[in-house]
């Protein structure tokens, strides 16, 4: 009987702990969203007179990032590393492998597009001094922007679903990945890419696939290093190497693509990039077996 009471007590304590953590995570989502929605437009008004479209486009994410800092300090009472991974340290080698695999794949596709249709890839005209200034801004701001999006639209909601650890069973992991796919697709409904796309359905599928597959890999690895790396690699490649006409994040890249948006080629590139990431990071997926659903 004593053992049964002890077991029941531990289960009850675990349930209360999960409820408290879920509540703090949910409140953090609300707080970060409030900073983004309420203070984002204020940041845009303050930064717009500078005359740099890239800074103006990223202004709302500065507000979002501030909300995350406040949330970590006062609601979650934990470090960013503790939020981002179940491991004792942030796994920079894993982050680096995922980043390079995705970035390298994007570079190969750019080379393919240039060789198969040279007229679709133009050198972006801009003075060298402006490009160097843009380089400094992008290297600092873009990782902040992508990390902020990851926290709000992937890390916090997935943590709510999985509980204390990311090592959950298959059904739990499937639900968390589907939830992430939905959350990644919805905020992009207002993007220019959707209105200018040859097929808006393909663009939405692109965002959803990005949300689902990257979350699935993150859960299997026991941390969000892969998600943070892939998102940063994607946006840094767009901002620095090859952007496209009508981009939601205007920059001064080396090249500009005039290819149509929302084509099956876009999905093929995303799939190839994520397959490359999986191959580069597969050693991280051999984590201890999660409890069965």
Name the predicted role of every residue range.
Residues 63-71, 99-110, 178-182:
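Hydrophobic alpha-helical transmembrane segments of multi-pass integral membrane proteins
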Residues 13, 17-21, 25, 49-57, ...:
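Membrane-helix interfacial "entry" motifs
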Residues 8-20, 69-75, 81, 194-221:
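Cytoplasmic juxtamembrane interface segments
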Residues 39, 43, 67, 108, ...:
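Hydrophobic/aromatic residues in alpha-helical transmembrane segments
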Residues 135-293:
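Transmembrane helix-loop-helix hairpins at the membrane interface
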Residues 1-79, 252-293:
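N-terminal, membrane-interfacial amphipathic/helix-forming hydrophobic leader that caps
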Residues 47, 56, 80-148, 158-166:
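Juxtamembrane helix-loop-helix connectors linking adjacent transmembrane helices
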Residues 21-29, 53-57, 61, 94-98, ...:
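Residue-level signature of transmembrane alpha-helical entry/exit and packing/kink sites
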């Amino acid at each position: 009987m004593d053992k049964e009471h002890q077991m029941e007590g531990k289960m009850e304590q675990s349930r209360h702990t999960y409820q408290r953590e879920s509540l703090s995570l949910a409140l953090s989502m609300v707080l970060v969203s409030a900073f983004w929605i309420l203070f984002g437009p204020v940041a845009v008004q303050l930064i717009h007179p500078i005359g740099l479209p890239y800074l103006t486009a990223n202004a709302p994410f500065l507000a979002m990032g501030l909300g995350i800092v406040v949330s970590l300090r006062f609601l979650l009472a934990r470090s960013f590393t503790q939020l981002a991974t179940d491991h004792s340290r942030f796994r920079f080698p894993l982050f680096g492998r995922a980043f390079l695999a995705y970035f390298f794949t994007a570079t190969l596709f750019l080379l393919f597009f240039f060789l198969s249709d040279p007229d679709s890839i133009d050198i972006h005209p801009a003075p060298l001094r402006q490009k160097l200034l843009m380089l400094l801004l992008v290297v600092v701001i873009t990782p902040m922007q992508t990390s902020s999006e990851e926290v709000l639209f992937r890390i916090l909601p997935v943590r709510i679903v999985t509980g204390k650890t990311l090592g959950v069973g298959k059904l739990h992991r499937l639900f968390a990945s589907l939830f992430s796919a939905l959350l990644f697709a919805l905020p992009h409904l207002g993007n220019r890419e959707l209105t200018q796309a040859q097929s808006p359905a393909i663009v939405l599928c692109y965002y959803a696939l990005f949300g689902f597959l990257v979350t699935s890999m993150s859960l299997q690895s026991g941390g969000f290093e892969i998600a943070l790396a892939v998102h940063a690699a994607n946006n840094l490649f767009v901002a620095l190497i090859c952007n496209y006409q009508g981009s939601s994040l205007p920059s001064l890249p080396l090249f500009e693509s005039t290819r149509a948006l929302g084509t099956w080629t876009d999905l093929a590139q995303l799939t190839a990039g994520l397959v490359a990431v999986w191959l580069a990071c597969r050693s991280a997926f051999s984590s201890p077996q999660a409890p069965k659903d």
